[in-house]
Amino acid sequence: MNRPERLQPGVKLRDADKVSRIPVKVVPSERDTMLRKPDWLRVKLPASNQRITDIKQALRKNGLHSVCEEASCPNLSECFNHGTATFMILGAICTRRCPFCDVAHGRPLKPDAEEPKKLAQTIKDMKLKYVVITSVDRDDLRDGGAQHFADCIREIRLLNPEIKIETLVPDFRGRIDAALEILATEPPDVFNHNLETAPMHYRKARPGANYQWSLDLLKKFKERHPNIPTKSGLMMGLGETNEEIAQVLHDLRAHNVEMLTLGQYLQPSKFHLPVERYVSPAEFDELKELAESIGFTHAACGPLVRSSYHADLQAQGKEVK
């Protein structure tokens, strides 16, 4: 039996190389078996790409990453033109191999100690009023990257005192309490952690993660910071039923989560998990009604909704779909 090749620091593994060692194997999709995208998933491209170019140049100038690009988000054009971006800290290489995600897997490099200052200056240069800070999973770090999050929040606020900051954090596997202790020194304005899918699909879609751990992370943060909104997001189209998603919504409310995003899963490549169904806008509307009826203060539900899609409007309680 051949031993797996040792990962080299800083080398990005994608597609087949990324998903080759996960528990539930992904069979590459054949074009004739892939579901055809419905018309409601067509993305309208902007008339001008100048704003997109400006933001990309600002990111490259300071060696920063956006999850918009790294995860191939379908809303990149709209969000960049709107003047918003979700910054991805701690590098662009994840220690997990989730087969729904287009972010590269591998052995990450040491965190850039100057990244918090570079991020703060970039945000100031871009004149942003609301930012989302997320990261890859960093299971290689003792605190899962929590101190780097806190450092980024502190530096951003020093240069941008009026800004609102939302964090979209990983699950801090095995170190939740230590991570929350660190984040308590610089808490965000909105705390977001995505459950992604229903628990019966975790082994297939989120190898290395645990549904209850993720719920506990959200609940424990809320217990420490009762006045800070907590938020979570789910994808549809991975094989779940609407009834399973409804149960997840009830679980989130039982753990005091107040804000919700619900969107359609889109397959990044033939090597990723296939789309098993396209959920209609009417079904998203029904789930939004359910979410609001059980106490979510804000629910953004629609085919192209993502956890950071118009996050500023979500935080203001405005409708996003």
UniProtKB/Swiss-Prot annotation:
Catalytic reaction(s) noted: [[Fe-S] cluster scaffold protein carrying a second [4Fe-4S](2+) cluster] + N(6)-octanoyl-L-lysyl-[protein] + 2 oxidized [2Fe-2S]-[ferredoxin] + 2 S-adenosyl-L-methionine + 4 H(+) = [[Fe-S] cluster scaffold protein] + N(6)-[(R)-dihydrolipoyl]-L-lysyl-[protein] + 4 Fe(3+) + 2 hydrogen sulfide + 2 5'-deoxyadenosine + 2 L-methionine + 2 reduced [2Fe-2S]-[ferredoxin]
Keywords, comma-separated and alphabetical: 4Fe-4S, Cytoplasm, Iron, Iron-sulfur, Metal-binding, S-adenosyl-L-methionine, Transferase
List of residues binding [4Fe-4S] cluster 1: 68, 73, 79, 308
SUPFAM superfamilies reported in the protein's UniProt record: Radical SAM enzymes (SSF102114)
A GO term, aspect molecular function: 4 iron, 4 sulfur cluster binding
Radical SAM core domain sequence ranges: 80-297
Cofactor notes: Binds 2 [4Fe-4S] clusters per subunit. One cluster is coordinated with 3 cysteines and an exchangeable S-adenosyl-L-methionine.
Pfam short name (any one): Radical_SAM
Chief site of localization: cytoplasm
Protein known as: Lipoyl synthase
